[in-house]
Amino acid sequence: MQLIIRIILIFILSISISSAYEIFVSLKKNKVNVRYGPSLDSEVKYVYKKINLPLKQIDKKENFRRIIDFKNNGGWIHISQLKKNNSVIATKDKILFKNPTSFAKPIALIKEGRLLILEKCEQEWCQITSGEFQGWVKTDNIWGFN
């Protein structure tokens, strides 16, 4: 019986430790290298060219963070290239509303894949800026916030 309890405790601790790394971050610069491993000596896998792009941090090792994007592409990025998350991606077409209610005046149609800058979130709504538009979107079908 004690063995079963110990196994359960180890399992619970491993889940809580791994989920502690899982936070959303954003790109600090317009050009950021994604590497195969957590080292500047590691080969560049690809390059992001979009400031504020939201990414999910899934692991960390010294000064590198392992990330995935909303399309599930992943690799390692140096922490100097990352900042606290300030954006989301629309994963489906969405309506931008003037106020945080579906009965509010629609302002614009946000297309799938559009980068949205987060202003604040309240319950199931987030206030965002997209180009010249500012308004509210429902939190379903957006990727990049905790």
Outline where the language-model segments fall.
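Sec-dependent signal peptide recognition
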Residues: 2-10
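Hydrophobic h-region of N-terminal signal peptides that target proteins for export
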Residues: 10-20
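SH3-family beta-barrel domains
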Residues: 18-36, 46-51, 58-99, 103-132, ...
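Second-shell loop/turn segments in exported
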Residues: 38-42
